Amino acid sequence: MSIHVVVMGVAGCGKSTVAEAIHERLGYVYAEGDDFHPQANIDKMSAGIPLTDEDRWPWLNVINSWMVAREALGENTVVSSSALKRSYREVLAKDVPTFFIHLNGSHELIQQRLSERKGHFMPPALLPSQFAILEPLVPEENGVEISIEGSVDEMVDRAIKALNAYATTVAATVAAQTATQAA
Protein backbone atom coordinates (compact mmCIF):
# COMPACT_ATOMS: atom_id res chain seq x y z
CA MET A 1 0.00 0.00 0.00
CA SER A 2 1.30 3.41 -0.96
CA ILE A 3 1.19 6.53 1.15
CA HIS A 4 -0.26 9.75 -0.20
CA VAL A 5 0.53 13.05 1.49
CA VAL A 6 -1.31 16.32 1.00
CA VAL A 7 0.55 19.36 2.31
CA MET A 8 -2.26 21.80 3.00
CA GLY A 9 -2.96 25.30 4.24
CA VAL A 10 -3.70 28.80 3.08
CA ALA A 11 -1.72 30.49 0.32
CA GLY A 12 1.80 31.45 1.33
CA CYS A 13 2.18 29.00 4.22
CA GLY A 14 4.91 26.96 2.50
CA LYS A 15 2.99 24.05 0.98
CA SER A 16 5.11 23.76 -2.15
CA THR A 17 8.37 24.18 -0.24
CA VAL A 18 7.52 21.42 2.26
CA ALA A 19 6.09 19.09 -0.41
CA GLU A 20 9.21 19.50 -2.55
CA ALA A 21 11.40 18.77 0.48
CA ILE A 22 9.45 15.57 1.23
CA HIS A 23 9.96 14.58 -2.41
CA GLU A 24 13.69 15.28 -2.18
CA ARG A 25 14.26 13.61 1.20
CA LEU A 26 11.92 10.62 0.91
CA GLY A 27 11.60 10.12 -2.84
CA TYR A 28 7.83 10.54 -2.94
CA VAL A 29 6.45 11.49 -6.36
CA TYR A 30 5.64 15.21 -6.17
CA ALA A 31 2.90 17.22 -7.81
CA GLU A 32 2.18 20.92 -7.43
CA GLY A 33 -1.56 21.20 -6.78
CA ASP A 34 -1.74 24.55 -8.55
CA ASP A 35 -0.71 22.81 -11.79
CA PHE A 36 -4.04 20.94 -11.77
CA HIS A 37 -6.16 24.11 -11.76
CA PRO A 38 -8.06 24.75 -14.99
CA GLN A 39 -7.25 28.06 -16.65
CA ALA A 40 -10.64 29.45 -15.59
CA ASN A 41 -9.66 29.04 -11.91
CA ILE A 42 -6.28 30.68 -12.48
CA ASP A 43 -7.93 33.58 -14.31
CA LYS A 44 -10.45 34.01 -11.50
CA MET A 45 -7.82 34.06 -8.75
CA SER A 46 -5.54 36.33 -10.81
CA ALA A 47 -8.44 38.79 -10.97
CA GLY A 48 -8.72 38.71 -7.17
CA ILE A 49 -11.92 36.64 -7.13
CA PRO A 50 -12.04 33.81 -4.57
CA LEU A 51 -12.88 30.35 -5.89
CA THR A 52 -16.24 28.80 -5.00
CA ASP A 53 -16.84 25.19 -4.06
CA GLU A 54 -18.12 24.63 -7.60
CA ASP A 55 -14.78 25.92 -8.94
CA ARG A 56 -12.84 23.60 -6.66
CA TRP A 57 -14.62 20.24 -7.08
CA PRO A 58 -13.22 19.43 -10.56
CA TRP A 59 -9.74 20.50 -9.47
CA LEU A 60 -9.86 18.32 -6.34
CA ASN A 61 -11.13 15.34 -8.34
CA VAL A 62 -8.24 15.67 -10.80
CA ILE A 63 -5.75 15.64 -7.91
CA ASN A 64 -7.49 12.57 -6.47
CA SER A 65 -7.29 10.84 -9.87
CA TRP A 66 -3.58 11.61 -10.04
CA MET A 67 -3.06 10.00 -6.60
CA VAL A 68 -5.15 6.97 -7.61
CA ALA A 69 -3.01 6.51 -10.74
CA ARG A 70 0.17 6.65 -8.63
CA GLU A 71 -1.38 4.18 -6.13
CA ALA A 72 -1.90 1.73 -9.01
CA LEU A 73 1.84 1.99 -9.72
CA GLY A 74 2.71 1.46 -6.05
CA GLU A 75 4.17 4.95 -5.72
CA ASN A 76 4.13 7.16 -2.64
CA THR A 77 3.04 10.70 -3.46
CA VAL A 78 3.14 14.18 -2.03
CA VAL A 79 0.98 16.97 -3.39
CA SER A 80 0.50 20.57 -2.34
CA SER A 81 -3.13 21.65 -2.13
CA SER A 82 -4.92 24.21 -0.01
CA ALA A 83 -7.49 21.56 1.09
CA LEU A 84 -9.09 24.25 3.23
CA LYS A 85 -12.35 22.49 4.04
CA ARG A 86 -12.96 19.01 5.37
CA SER A 87 -15.25 18.31 2.40
CA TYR A 88 -12.32 19.13 0.07
CA ARG A 89 -10.06 16.75 1.99
CA GLU A 90 -12.71 14.04 1.76
CA VAL A 91 -12.59 14.32 -2.04
CA LEU A 92 -8.80 14.12 -2.03
CA ALA A 93 -8.75 11.08 0.28
CA LYS A 94 -11.80 9.22 -1.01
CA ASP A 95 -9.89 6.55 -2.97
CA VAL A 96 -6.44 6.35 -1.41
CA PRO A 97 -4.97 6.37 2.11
CA THR A 98 -4.06 10.01 2.64
CA PHE A 99 -2.10 11.85 5.31
CA PHE A 100 -2.62 15.60 5.63
CA ILE A 101 0.11 17.95 6.81
CA HIS A 102 -1.56 21.24 7.71
CA LEU A 103 0.91 24.11 7.73
CA ASN A 104 -0.41 26.69 10.15
CA GLY A 105 0.76 30.17 11.04
CA SER A 106 -0.42 33.61 11.92
CA HIS A 107 -2.27 35.77 9.43
CA GLU A 108 0.46 38.41 9.79
CA LEU A 109 3.36 36.04 9.03
CA ILE A 110 1.60 34.51 6.03
CA GLN A 111 0.58 37.94 4.72
CA GLN A 112 4.24 38.99 4.91
CA ARG A 113 5.35 35.87 3.01
CA LEU A 114 2.70 36.42 0.34
CA SER A 115 3.76 40.03 -0.15
CA GLU A 116 7.34 38.83 -0.76
CA ARG A 117 6.34 36.05 -3.20
CA LYS A 118 6.93 36.75 -6.86
CA GLY A 119 5.39 35.23 -9.98
CA HIS A 120 2.33 33.54 -8.48
CA PHE A 121 -1.23 34.07 -9.66
CA MET A 122 -2.69 34.14 -6.13
CA PRO A 123 -2.81 37.77 -4.95
CA PRO A 124 -2.31 38.54 -1.23
CA ALA A 125 -5.75 40.19 -1.22
CA LEU A 126 -7.37 36.72 -1.33
CA LEU A 127 -5.71 35.53 1.90
CA PRO A 128 -8.58 36.67 4.18
CA SER A 129 -11.05 34.62 2.11
CA GLN A 130 -8.88 31.54 2.62
CA PHE A 131 -8.64 32.01 6.37
CA ALA A 132 -12.42 32.56 6.46
CA ILE A 133 -13.18 29.10 5.06
CA LEU A 134 -10.27 27.18 6.64
CA GLU A 135 -11.48 24.20 8.67
CA PRO A 136 -8.77 22.65 10.87
CA LEU A 137 -8.14 18.93 10.75
CA VAL A 138 -10.37 16.87 13.03
CA PRO A 139 -9.32 13.70 14.89
CA GLU A 140 -11.08 11.45 12.35
CA GLU A 141 -8.75 12.70 9.63
CA ASN A 142 -5.26 11.27 9.22
CA GLY A 143 -3.02 14.24 9.67
CA VAL A 144 -1.05 16.66 11.73
CA GLU A 145 -0.82 20.41 12.16
CA ILE A 146 2.69 21.83 11.78
CA SER A 147 3.70 25.34 12.80
CA ILE A 148 5.39 27.40 10.11
CA GLU A 149 7.44 29.24 12.74
CA GLY A 150 11.19 28.72 12.48
CA SER A 151 13.32 27.71 9.54
CA VAL A 152 12.18 25.70 6.53
CA ASP A 153 14.41 22.80 7.66
CA GLU A 154 12.75 22.78 11.09
CA MET A 155 9.31 22.81 9.50
CA VAL A 156 10.24 19.97 7.12
CA ASP A 157 11.80 17.95 9.95
CA ARG A 158 8.56 18.22 11.96
CA ALA A 159 6.51 17.20 8.93
CA ILE A 160 8.70 14.19 8.12
CA LYS A 161 8.71 13.04 11.75
CA ALA A 162 4.89 13.03 11.74
CA LEU A 163 4.78 11.35 8.33
CA ASN A 164 7.18 8.61 9.46
CA ALA A 165 4.99 7.93 12.51
CA TYR A 166 1.96 7.64 10.22
CA ALA A 167 3.85 5.33 7.82
CA THR A 168 4.81 3.06 10.72
CA THR A 169 1.16 2.86 11.80
CA VAL A 170 0.04 2.07 8.25
CA ALA A 171 2.68 -0.66 7.92
CA ALA A 172 1.60 -2.24 11.22
CA THR A 173 -2.06 -2.15 10.17
CA VAL A 174 -1.30 -3.77 6.81
CA ALA A 175 0.81 -6.45 8.52
CA ALA A 176 -2.00 -7.21 10.99
CA GLN A 177 -4.58 -7.42 8.18
CA THR A 178 -2.32 -9.72 6.18
CA ALA A 179 -1.78 -11.98 9.20
CA THR A 180 -5.54 -12.12 9.86
CA GLN A 181 -6.30 -12.99 6.24
CA ALA A 182 -3.63 -15.72 6.23
CA ALA A 183 -5.01 -17.34 9.39
Identify the residue ranges that each predicted region occupies:
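Conserved phosphate-donor/acceptor-positioning beta-strand/loop module used by diverse small-molecule
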Residues: D95-R113, I146
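Hydrophobic anchor at the beta1->P-loop junction of P-loop NTPases
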Residues: V7
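P-loop (Walker A) phosphate-binding loop of NTP-binding proteins
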Residues: V10
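Walker A (P-loop) ATP-phosphate-binding motif of ABC ATPase nucleotide-binding domains
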Residues: H4
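C-terminal accessory "lid"/substrate-recognition subdomains
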Residues: N164-A183
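Conserved substrate/cofactor phosphate-moiety recognition/catalytic segment
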Residues: C13, E20-S65
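Small-molecule kinase domains that catalyze NTP-dependent phosphoryl transfer to phosphate-bearing small molecules
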Residues: R117-R158, Y166
